[in-house]
Amino acid sequence: MFEKNFPIISVQKVNKEIGNHRILNDISFSVFPGEIFGIIGHSGSGKSTLLRCLDFLVSPTSGSISVAGFHNLHSDKTNSRLAFAKRVAYISQSCGLFSAKTVFENIVYPLKLHYPDMTKSLIEEKVDNALDFLNLYERKHAYPSRLSGGQKQKVAIAIAIVSDPVVLLCDEITSALDPRSTEDVTDKLLKLNEERGITQVFVSHEIEVVKKLCCQTLVMHQGAIEELGPTEKLFLNPRSSITEELFHMNSIAKGIYNHGENEEILRLGFSQGLAVQGMISKLIQDGQISINILSGDINLFRKVPLGFLIIALSGDKEEREKAKDILIKKGVIIQQLQKTK
């Protein structure tokens, strides 16, 4: 339905002002079919406002937005809210379940709204499929008050996907969940993307979730784009101090370690297969340098291991440069955090 080489979401020069306060400032980006696109930033950076603009719940002051063939600049007659909601589903942190309806009745509601002529048997089949996918079938006749937080959020996902949308807009949907429920929900979102190709825009302050899900990430700061690119590149080689802070990279090590003479503090980024190779120990054995590992981590980015180390590299300048050249040739990304004295 939507060609892979053309954006399913296009945002061009979007601004949003309330009174004299600019909430969004010249935002432009594209999301292609089948991507999971992350939006991160500190509180008040404009993330949720931007997502509501994508759902046409909020109108930008200026700029154009296209989502799944619908455009903010077209007339209301062209942009039927009901037709839009069949293609684009919005999931919020609050879940928004009807407390007086069972799980089944909550999920049935959008189907009856979008497909009034659908047979009862087909409705039940589609709801059961959604419940099976989310491991909720046994809770089919339960009321929301009898569900855990993770189960409620999965019901909200079932409500969103039962009408077969092409885009999911997710606003902080894991922020109130415990770690196990968060992992369960993110596994289901990733499976939706892999098996059904559903494009997702994922707003979150939980960086571990963004690492796991998102192939592209937009970093926002004070209503503007701070940085935009593949999530693993933002992790391995952030260009902005805001991005570095959000990804919890090296702020602690930079502040507490005072390096000596003939020593420099480096951050080493290991992409894909490099993350599991023991090249550091080999480097120490082969060269006239010493390495003190200050901190490090290995993360899975959409099931691919990526890692970083913060090290103190000691030795003569010539030997340090040789060591860095070897690492660079092997594909390691190096950033100098503190220079030699």
From Swiss-Prot:
Cross-referenced PROSITE patterns: ABC_TRANSPORTER_1, ABC_TRANSPORTER_2, METN
Disulfide bonds: none
SMART domains named among the record's database cross-references: AAA, NIL
UniProt membrane topology term: Peripheral membrane protein
GO function term, MF aspect, one: ATP hydrolysis activity
Broad class of enzyme this protein falls into: translocase
Gene3D superfamilies for the chain: 3.30.70.260, P-loop containing nucleotide triphosphate hydrolases
Keyword Signal: no
Residue ranges constituting the ABC transporter domain according to the UniProt record: 9-247
Cellular component aspect of the GO annotation: plasma membrane
Family in the record: Belongs to the ABC transporter superfamily. Methionine importer (TC 3.A.1.24) family.
Name of the protein: Methionine import ATP-binding protein MetN
